[in-house]
Amino acid sequence: MDENKIIEVAHLKYEYPQASRLALNDLSVSINAGEWVAIIGHNGSGKSTFAKSLNGLLDLQSGDITIDGLPLSIETVWDIRRKIGMVFQNPDNQFVGATVEDDVAFGLENQGIERTEMQRRVQDAVDRVGMTQFMTREPSRLSGGQKQRVALAGIIAQQPEILILDEATSMLDPKGRQEVLETIHTLKQETNMTVLSITHDIDEAASADRIVMLDKGQVIDQGTPAEIFAYGQRLLDLGLDVPYPEKLKAALTKLGVPMPVDYLTTERMVDHLWTLHSKM
């Protein structure tokens, strides 16, 4: 295995009972240590199935998965699960503690972590996600964004090498989504954790180092956000959205305004339009 590759999957196949086609159809991809990769695709493209396969939640028909040098098997599955932390769509389904502090500590108690070390990890985790002042609060009384930050703290406390976000921001309002993404950005900068984001949210995908596109259980393309977003119409054809600057660029092009062919972020779009205006 390439020492830079923390996740390597090859020729994965999986079919749900009574399904008309494979959910994963000869899927192969690799992810570097410390990389943030967004997996995008329409509903039914295989995104969540792929995520669940990585820590042995599914019994694959065929294929190989290697996590940090360990081939996934019955013998290694628990070692691999300790390397991976998952945050799901609905944080309420992950809460077990009566307070934020209890909930963040729960996974550590199951691992038999010594009490002093457990207290240190819990405090560090809630500090990192900006929830220190809510330590004694009931999770059910928090906002959506706050709940996901607590769920994230519970994962951080366990110190995994890989963080998987399985549609973790899809049920949040824009403010809550931004809170969670900013928290992950900060965490990534401080720890260099590998992040795998399963999403159909283009703004979330834009935060990644690389985007992998799935369709019908297969990887159909991958590249930087700028490379993928430049496809424009192809994303729409796959049932995905395109960033607002790309929509604006298409509309301006139809009006005859000269626009570059590559993807423009909001900042670059403003700079480009300002340059055009100054030349008028």
Swiss-Prot record:
Keywords: ATP-binding, Cell membrane, Membrane, Nucleotide-binding, Translocase, Transport. Its main location: membrane. GO terms for cellular component: ATP-binding cassette (ABC) transporter complex. GO terms for molecular function: ATP binding; ATP hydrolysis activity; ATPase-coupled transmembrane transporter activity. InterPro entries: AAA+_ATPase, ABC_transporter-like_ATP-bd, ABC_transporter-like_CS, ABC_transpr_CbiO/EcfA_su, ECF_ABC_transporter_ATP-bd, EcfA_1, P-loop_NTPase. It is an enzyme of class 7 (translocase). Its EC number is 7.-.-.-. ATP binds at G41, H42, N43, G44, S45, G46, K47, S48. Forms a stable energy-coupling factor (ECF) transporter complex composed of 2 membrane-embedded substrate-binding proteins (S component), 2 ATP-binding proteins (A component) and 2 transmembrane proteins (T component). ATP-binding (A) component of a common energy-coupling factor (ECF) ABC-transporter complex. Unlike classic ABC transporters this ECF transporter provides the energy necessary to transport a number of different substrates. This is Energy-coupling factor transporter ATP-binding protein EcfA1. It comes from Latilactobacillus sakei subsp. sakei (strain 23K). The lineage of its organism: Bacteria, Bacillati, Bacillota, Bacilli, Lactobacillales.
